[in-house]
């Protein structure tokens, strides 16, 4: 009997409040199992990932946040490798301190190889996402890496590790699938219509969505719940280039 990979799609938050339960986690326990949705702050997300490690079952966490920086930025920081970059970032008191320190080194905001190849909306140091980048790396990935969790493709993890954490991006997924990838976030009838178009496509792709959750996803003007649901689908096969071993990759 096939052992199903438990997939968690996570719409992340880098808010100063610790996420304040704004993070959405959509979980699939099986191909024919209805998706389950919960809220968490960043501490709660970390606890959920650790609980998955402890249960010994195969878990894949697809998290919508940048897991690394572009090579030119890393070179400006004078560090080597993903771990060196992550430790350097964690040496700052918070996301704003890190961005201020980074801007004393460079004001350039280069995109990573994955940002180019997989068409993510913006680079990891952009004003709109830098908090997500710092909090994901420093509050989630650094402790997990220290605990032997596999972080694809930058940390191999401990032998026998069944839990994998990776970066994912709903916008990239939507473009890869040829689905509408713009205009589904916001107030008004047109964004709602786009959400109403996207969700049935996810269902046809294999996502079992309870009616109440589907209604919430359509009504959610920020698109957070829909993003989490999209990331609960299986990622497409991909081959990460050598740059990804330092910058990270989008799955």
Q: Which role does the model predict for each range below?
A:
Residues 2-251:
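RNase H-like (RuvC/DEDD) metal-dependent nuclease/polynucleotide-processing core
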